[in-house]
């Protein structure tokens, strides 16, 4: 509420509604939510008109002073009531349907606890014969007026503007509920002379006396006279539940040093509202403005707030006056300088307060005499102050708290108003105070509290992470960042993979270890996946674009990862290493299969036949043999298969494709197992021809033996000569003839 009060006083542009008193032409900015929370009148008004931004109140019974005090109570939880403004506050509270404040003011009027009003105040006309009549019917029946169905309030819109509402009096004057004829203002003040005290105004016979018995009358200077020099202080403490906490009579004091008996402070009982020095100064300025407008002639008032924040006092200063005309002239002079000039002069006078307080027993509040011993209420108030731990006025002055009052002469001079040059200087000083620039950035603040908060949050207390350099406003955010992003490593229990965030581990367990259900499926092939991101990656398989090409062999791929895996075949790199035996592998699935050797068992085991597998892909294909599921169907013949590779192999029988060629003879095969068997056979024949070491014919090329090494292959001519390594046949006849031979031959 303190911040909202600052907006109301210094930043009216931030308020969302303006209260306008049409007869007086006064504007009061406020907040809808705050007004609706305290006043039933504003609650019903804003409920009916939700876009309302301007409320014009054309009510004769609503005065600016009363409305200002009501707003001060709503925003600061303190209501300052004296004999000068109690009727205005009561009227405003009754019209705005604030029953608690109206009841409290009515009780004060009935009990006559406020004393006679000051000069210029408007008092109700009372019969001169009796001084203690009952309360006027206007204040007794004000609640009935608010609830009477016969007097409805009129809400009239002004023109086509839907954001403005005018509230006027309902039926004018009604019998019994309108105040009686209010007489003219009766001035009541004293003229001090050497011979004594004489009355300068009319006789106060029509004014009510204070209750308190003969002893109280003696303190006030007798039953028939009223002296402000000898008056006592009456403090009435009332909470919002219309319960009077206690009524105490304060010590006697000098004129202007102590609060008048017409001053009563109404505050909340809990005392939880604490205000800064700036708010106290604002309240003082508002009170001074009200006194000047009402013409009370009571001078400036200072508000002194106790440590509990639940009780306050209002002090008045008496002005030297000799006649009613002179008093009016002094009031005009006081209205000349602004409230800011009075505030600056008051601060200058406060510096000389201690010196002025030592000059005499009447120089300050600390020099007041104790009340008479027969005053039981004064003793009770002092005991309550001691019980709360409130320091004495002298101790408060030593501690640098509220400064004591200056001497009467200085006070009267300041009340008349400082020179014009001092007033201009005070205005400049106040404007300088309202602008607090930041030393490190070009921002400017109207309040020092906002500047300090800006410095603490933006410049001074930025929390920086030592590892990554990120900046945080709060230390708790930095600690959370370190636990989640920088230092914390969460490992998977199954495979030991580390993660920085817990949700990454959950996703890993769902996808890799199969703890989750595949909820996302492809619209084309109805294949299911764990996440939608996997579905988008899978959609590449249905496209014909292959933008990734191998520079070595020219093979194209649809994904960049497939090209990286393929490039390992050409480079021979084995990036995956086993931590147990340091054996390296080219692919990650090979490492996973190898890890089953160290673990002692394979990760996936069939519950039907007990067969185990290293990879979940093989395990899923095996499980389809038990369930009989064959989701892959040939488009040509309609035959179904358990896996996609088997269906692709079968499709080659229809297309005649033979993608596997032999490196030795160039023959092509449809399946990889057929090529493998052919390579074994081809290698055995070629190895036998090369192991005999027979040189090739001189006229033949070196590849000639390879041409004769395949005599059994189909398609080759069968009239080839025998291999040259075979032994020659034996000769039929001997090359040399002997005599015996001849004889035999001849025989």
From Swiss-Prot:
Function field: May be involved in transcriptional regulation.
Top-level taxon: Eukaryota
Annotated stretches, region: Disordered: 243-424, 694-747
Zinc finger C2H2-type: from-to: 436-459, 463-485, 490-513, 520-542, 548-570, 576-598, 604-626, 632-654, 660-687
GO CC terms: nucleus
Domain (BTB) ranges: 15-83
Ranges of Basic and acidic residues composition bias in the record: 267-277, 380-398
Biased composition (Acidic residues): 278-354
UniProt feature, compositional bias: Pro residues: 719-733
GO molecular function per UniProt: DNA binding; DNA-binding transcription factor activity, RNA polymerase II-specific; zinc ion binding
Protein name as it appears in the record: Zinc finger and BTB domain-containing protein 47
Keywords: DNA-binding, Isopeptide bond, Metal-binding, Nucleus, Repeat, Transcription, Transcription regulation, Ubl conjugation, Zinc, Zinc-finger
Gene3D superfamilies in alphabetical order: Classic Zinc Finger, Potassium Channel Kv1.1, Chain A
SUPFAM superfamilies attached to this UniProt entry: beta-beta-alpha zinc fingers, POZ domain
CDD domains with a match to the protein in the record: BTB_POZ_ZBTB47_ZNF651
Family label: Belongs to the krueppel C2H2-type zinc-finger protein family.
GO biological process: regulation of transcription by RNA polymerase II
Principal location: nucleus
